[in-house]
Amino acid sequence: MKEEFYLAGKILKPKGLRGEVKIQPVTDFPDSYLERKIFYVGKSEEEAVRRTVRQAALRKGFAYLLFSGIDTREKAEEIVGFSVFVRSDALIQLPPDRAYLHELRGLKVLNERHEELGIIEDVLGMPAHDVYEIRAEGGLVYVPAVEEFVEEISIDEGYMVLKRFEEFL
């Protein structure tokens, strides 16, 4: 069975001479970089190699990691642009009112009367708040991911109820 991986960040550049790399986290929980001991690093999920974290730090919104087997600047330069993944079984347990992006993609979107309106294609990270990209009958519709418009989310049952959806058509 193929392991499932989820994107946790992108390697931006080496830092220093010992192989440390600067990473742009793609998570609402950057502190998890300080706690995790294992990441998978590669150009893609299929090419990802298991790496043990020897040292971790967070500074100004970036993670700085020193991986085993990457002990020179030259080796660090070889993985610049690579993605950093975590295995699905290593994801942090979220509180009931939170969900991972991969759990939201594909959810049915319903109105207050529970009539189907479309499917969530993606969740876009915007400066003010996330935005749901919904494939509806007339094309793509963008709805702010805020309480004012979200009545209910049921990951287990596979749907999201939106209020005032017609305002975005």
Swiss-Prot record:
Gene3D superfamilies: PRC-barrel domain (2.30.30.240), RimM (2.40.30.60)
Molecular function per GO: ribosome binding
Subcellular location: Cytoplasm
GO biological process, any: ribosomal small subunit biogenesis
rRNA processing in keyword set: yes
Domain of life: Bacteria
Main location: cytoplasm
Keywords: Chaperone, Cytoplasm, Ribosome biogenesis, rRNA processing
GO CC list: cytoplasm; ribosome
Function, in words: An accessory protein needed during the final step in the assembly of 30S ribosomal subunit, possibly for assembly of the head region. Essential for efficient processing of 16S rRNA. May be needed both before and after RbfA during the maturation of 16S rRNA. It has affinity for free ribosomal 30S subunits but not for 70S ribosomes.
Annotated family: Belongs to the RimM family.
HAMAP family reported in the protein's UniProt record: Ribosome_mat_RimM
Comment field on protein domains: The PRC barrel domain binds ribosomal protein uS19.
Protein name in UniProt: Ribosome maturation factor RimM
